[in-house]
């Protein structure tokens, strides 16, 4: 089974891993990349500041789960997987335009908590906070992505046999 940029949207992770385990045959592989610990950290801090000034708790609104490699390894192993490799990889990613379209798409859970007339001004405030951190010298917005990549297998059943005398 393969997953790309989806698992961090699915809750609770234990139920997701249980579903993957049930879908795989013994010996099957589970390979994925998802948001990892500190993924979009600057963006989340800026959203938290802007929403906090409006009386909203960004942490409660967040649709994401960005675990560390150690935390997700523990969940994979608890679900019965053998982890072959797991790592957190920084992956700064250039955005095709400014941060505002990214926020409107991926930050809807945050901005959608605001009344409609407040969304664009809040989005602009977030962009103002992020500009010194996420815009490079050429003027390109760079999202501070951090990915969690892993390969895990569902072990084959232990061979069962009856010893012959």
Q: Whereabouts are the PLM-identified features?
A:
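C-terminal helical/coil "lid" or tail adjacent to the Rossmann-like core of SAM-dependent
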Residues: 79, 84-137
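A conserved beta-strand element that flanks and buttresses the S-adenosyl-L-methionine
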Residues: 2
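A short glycine-rich, Lys/Arg-flanked "PGG" loop and its adjoining helix->strand segment in the class I
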Residues: 14-29
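Cationic, low-complexity basic patches in intrinsically disordered or flexible, solvent-exposed regions
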Residues: 165
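Core SAM-dependent methyltransferase catalytic element
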Residues: 79-81, 104-108, 147-162
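A short His-aromatic
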Residues: 8-10
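Conserved class I S-adenosyl-L-methionine
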Residues: 29-54
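Short alpha-helix
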Residues: 64-79
